[in-house]
Amino acid sequence: MSPAPVQVMGVLNVTDDSFSDGGCYLDLDDAVKHGLAMAAAGAGIVDVGGESSRPGATRVDPAVETSRVIPVVKELAAQGITVSIDTMRADVARAALQNGAQMVNDVSGGRADPAMGPLLAEADVPWVLMHWRAVSADTPHVPVRYGNVVAEVRADLLASVADAVAAGVDPARLVLDPGLGFAKTAQHNWAILHALPELVATGIPVLVGASRKRFLGALLAGPDGVMRPTDGRDTATAVISALAALHGAWGVRVHDVRASVDAIKVVEAWMGAERIERDG
């Protein structure tokens, strides 16, 4: 059976401290140009964020976050780009939606701001609920101890779904993200990826965000043990995009859009050829 077309979400960080591209797109023209380039490369969604969630990052003032993202969201939306706003704050999400954003990507899974659920129930737009069990902890990036990471992440995500539905959100608008690298070890991340079909089996769309993350840098470390730099992790990211597509993911969130678009096209052609051979 041929997989459904996979959404490729391009990452656009309008921040000064994101782990991969912090400081690259603080200028409005640079940010818009990059967003348009990702769309031209095949991104169906451009995910605009104004606050880094990398380990060690400090939270920014809501006004700063808003001032960073709104001009970019507004300009990209005006040019016909489907824009997602990457934020944990309902006020930022509201402003972005009012300026053309069509989706909310919430790395807290709705746990950081109780106003997010009611807002998105009213707005009726897609909402990505990411798993980050330690989001409210004093040390939110220290890996959590899990008994069975796959079962627990799945249960936590379904609890977030239940909370969203209780707030009035249409369950058909929800997308799940297992939160690779968020208070998880490399072993946790690989276990979750291996068990991706278990998340897909919930019937709720699943977004995979592995792009350039630390566990890939560790996997690709040289003989000296030095971790592969972030800009050298795109091939590995594209392989994960291909495997995620093969196993039924709804979408992938990536920095290098073209590499993942190409990888997914290979999977779709491979599976399509199998179908043609069988039907012929």
Swiss-Prot record:
One of its GO terms (cellular component) is cytosol. Mg(2+) binds at N13. One of its GO terms (biological process) is tetrahydrofolate biosynthetic process. Magnesium is required for activity, even if it seems to interact primarily with the substrate. Optimum pH is 8. It is an enzyme of class 2 (transferase). Pathway: Cofactor biosynthesis; tetrahydrofolate biosynthesis; 7,8-dihydrofolate from 2-amino-4-hydroxy-6-hydroxymethyl-7,8-dihydropteridine diphosphate and 4-aminobenzoate: step 1/2. Catalyzes the condensation of para-aminobenzoate (pABA) with 6-hydroxymethyl-7,8-dihydropterin diphosphate (DHPt-PP) to form 7,8-dihydropteroate (H2Pte), the immediate precursor of folate derivatives. Is involved in the bioactivation of the antituberculous drug para-aminosalicylic acid (PAS). PAS is a close structural analog of pABA and acts as an alternative substrate for DHPS, leading to hydroxy-dihydropteroate (H2PtePAS). Metabolomic studies show that PAS, despite its in vitro activity as a competitive inhibitor of DHPS, does not inhibit growth of M.tuberculosis by inhibiting DHPS. PAS exerts its antimycobacterial activity through its effects on M.tuberculosis folate metabolism downstream of DHPS. Belongs to the DHPS family. PANTHER family: FOLATE SYNTHESIS PROTEINS, FOLIC ACID SYNTHESIS PROTEIN FOL1. This is Dihydropteroate synthase. It comes from Mycobacterium tuberculosis (strain ATCC 25618 / H37Rv). The gene is folP1.
